[in-house]
Amino acid sequence: MAPIRRSSRLAERYDAIESKKRSLKRLEEQIKAEEEQFSDKMKQLEDEIKIKEQVITMFKRKTVRREWMRNSRQATTNINIAQIESLKLQLEEGEKDIAEAEKQAEPTTPQQEAELSETFKQMVRDRMKVKDVDEKLLQQYMKKENVEFEWRSCFICTMEYSRTDKNLHPIILNCGHNLCRSCINKLTGNGIVKCPFDRLDTRVRVTGLPRNLALINL
């Protein structure tokens, strides 16, 4: 009988050891899973902190730039203001001519209609000249003074928007702010993007958020 009892005790010890091994394995798996979850949460927090730091840096840079612009307004005297004023004067005169023609009488003959149409077309051409000159002179000034066009770059990563790189496409949020697709993806959680500027939510549709084609084509 003694050998049987000894064998039974050994079997019980073996079962107890195996049970402890299984418990230890489950505990190790649980610890590993918790470590992975903790690592994921830490990475998410680090990404959020990085984005917040980038936003703070962006706002600081914009504040410094606005102060610089206020202090350097005198530089605009180098722009050929006379050329702009001359074109604007032509535009005003064209508008006055049309207003005067409308006061005198409605066009009753093909010739009068043609004259009025030509006056209107000339006014449109003058307006476009003013617009083109304004834009060209502004670009010259910005280039000369080494001022960046902030709206051409993502406000978070400061990368310039790209037509070819999909990650740098400008994406429009519901609140109207633009960010690159890469930063949008980092900010997206549970299908919702929270704007870092006004904290408004934008739900990501199945087809994705719309691109700002106007910024891409500039």
Swiss-Prot record:
Name of protein: Uncharacterized RING finger protein B0416.4
Superkingdom assignment: Eukaryota
Keywords of this entry: Metal-binding, Zinc, Zinc-finger
GO-annotated molecular function: zinc ion binding
Segments forming RING-type zinc fingers: 154-199
One Pfam short name: zf-RING_UBOX
Xref: Gene3D superfamilies: Zinc/RING finger domain, C3HC4 (zinc finger)
InterPro entries: E3_ubiquitin-ligase_RING, Znf-RING_euk, Znf_RING, Znf_RING/FYVE/PHD, Znf_RING_CS
The keyword Zinc is assigned to this record: yes
